[in-house]
Amino acid sequence: MGLKAAQKTLFPLRSIDDVVRLFAAELGREEPDLVLLSLVLGFVEHFLAVNRVIPTNVPELTFQPSPAPDPPGGLTYFPVADLSIIAALYARFTAQIRGAVDLSLYPREGGVSSRELVKKVSDVIWNSLSRSYFKDRAHIQSLFSFITGTKLDSSGVAFAVVGACQALGLRDVHLALSEDHAWVVFGPNGEQTAEVTWHGKGNEDRRGQTVNAGVAERSWLYLKGSYMRCDRKMEVAFMVCAINPSIDLHTDSLELLQLQQKLLWLLYDLGHLERYPMALGNLADLEELEPTPGRPDPLTLYHKGIASAKTYYRDEHIYPYMYLAGYHCRNRNVREALQAWADTATVIQDYNYCREDEEIYKEFFEVANDVIPNLLKEAASLLEAGEERPGEQTQGTQSQGSALQDPECFAHLLRFYDGICKWEEGSPTPVLHVGWATFLVQSLGRFEGQVRQKVRIVSREAEAAEAEEPWGEEAREGRRRGPRRESKPEEPPPPKKPALDKGPGAGQGAVPGPPRKPPGTVPGTARGAEGGSAAPVPAPAASPPPEGPVLTFQSEKMKGMKELLVATKINSSAIKLQLTAQSQVQMKKQKVSTPSDYTLSFLKRQRKGL
């Protein structure tokens, strides 16, 4: 069973618009042909990014010239996807899968697939791969790479399994995606899960197993169960997002960028990106590079991605906020960038940092110890230059420099670190080490003492206890001294991190004083009648409203440092000691880590940029 007649009529594909028409036709069907679309994208990507030299020894392969916008009068060449080439690749893949899987050996009760059948398909893909190749190399995510080079990256293997299942008629097997991993769901209503690929350094022994253990340990890799369960149209969106336009470390293929942008807009118009936050962020990045007339601006798309994560995934995705922060950072919007990073940390605080969460650790490490310090350093330079030459700065540079005089910016910085510290609590792997502390002190020092002192840090737990437990003055005095940091080994651990009322910016965010502050949260205001006394008591004079933002810390480390953070002079030694100390929860769960537990070897690897 090969290509259908309606599919054949769309060939040859001579341009970007021809490829878009093919995708539009497939998306109009109930079951888009994943194998066909992946082969086409892989073919185009190979000859536009991997091998841009026009071959002369392949008689069937031709290139279509068209005018290039840059330089004016130049030509660009698009690889012509001829029917004979694509049909041969298609037939080879389907024959390989159908020849290796005997469906009669795997009865499908109720028309749904069994775990053994899914594992068998996974074995076929896995055993067809080359035994030795660099699995993180670029351009090996498509079925074109699988057929022509027997190479696939991690997510490419998962997609190939889904494509193979579709070729076998297993319509209940779909792709499941977190922000750094892929597996499959199958069975009635997609209730069953199965690992089909590796992650990180390789976990071959997990194939066929469920992801329940990863969900239960609250690791970011499995998003606590708030992962994407794709339908066929979202699987098409996944392969479009996986297009890699890079020719080398410094150059991208303009044609591939245009193709990806047009295909994402096609999916957007059909409503297939509504549940795909990272695709919306990807599209926003492309629009920032080359805006499409009449389309929403990048900022709108970034916020749509955040709204999608809130609506469909319990606001437990990290990258929608990372996309937004990266946009503001590139545009030197210091206040907005710090707020978005703080929101990112607010999401991560409800996870446990596990061994396989290294990718998001690297993202946070880079933000905290490279991006934010450099952004604040640049703002400090602009502020200093503005004081020396006040009439020579533009409005944008003045705004960037003034961020260091804004207590709300400082509150966002504290909220960012509070989320990181909370993330570490209860985690089996430590997060913070002296490298973090050094740059925290540096970033704190960018804000003057009078700016830092305008941030009011309150303790929600202390206020609630004081309101509900009318103990004596001695007990209240003990609470004012703050919780002791020592803990005994036999003490029961505190409850798990709450999942309620945790939305970014809500409950713990930096909010400017009275207008946005809910009533009853500032100590000293009337709490209402608490005894049974009927005699009216004269209300005390209203306390003056707080001058700056009000912040509630969630982590024990930041609670212990709150006086240090807003002191007139920064005590760098005390802050470093407090930040790198093991939290109470960790002391009960594991022995104190040695310095060798903290490895910086990943800094030598290439990282994704913001």
Curated annotation (Swiss-Prot):
Location in the cell: Nucleus
Organism: Bos taurus (Bovine)
Domain of life: Eukaryota
The protein's name: Menin
Keywords noted in UniProt: Chromatin regulator, DNA-binding, Nucleus, Phosphoprotein, Repressor, Transcription, Transcription regulation
Regions of compositional bias (Pro residues) in chain numbering: 512-521, 537-548
Subunit structure: Component of the MLL-HCF complex, at least composed of KMT2A/MLL1, MEN1, ASH2L, RBBP5, DPY30, WDR5, HCFC1 and HCFC2. Component of the menin-associated histone methyltransferase complex, at least composed of KMT2B/MLL4, MEN1, ASH2L, RBBP5, DPY30 and WDR5. Interacts with POLR2B. Interacts with POLR2A phosphorylated at 'Ser-5', but not with the unphosphorylated, nor 'Ser-2' phosphorylated POLR2A forms. Interacts with FANCD2 and DBF4. Interacts with SMAD3, but not with SMAD2, nor SMAD4. Directly interacts with NFKB1, NFKB2 and RELA.
Function as written in the Swiss-Prot or TrEMBL entry: Essential component of a MLL/SET1 histone methyltransferase (HMT) complex, a complex that specifically methylates 'Lys-4' of histone H3 (H3K4). Functions as a transcriptional regulator. Binds to the TERT promoter and represses telomerase expression. Plays a role in TGFB1-mediated inhibition of cell-proliferation, possibly regulating SMAD3 transcriptional activity. Represses JUND-mediated transcriptional activation on AP1 sites, as well as that mediated by NFKB subunit RELA. Positively regulates HOXC8 and HOXC6 gene expression.
Principal subcellular localization: nucleus
Example of a GO cellular component annotation carried by this entry: chromatin
Skewed-composition ranges (Basic and acidic residues): 484-500
Region (Interaction with FANCD2), start-end ranges: 214-390
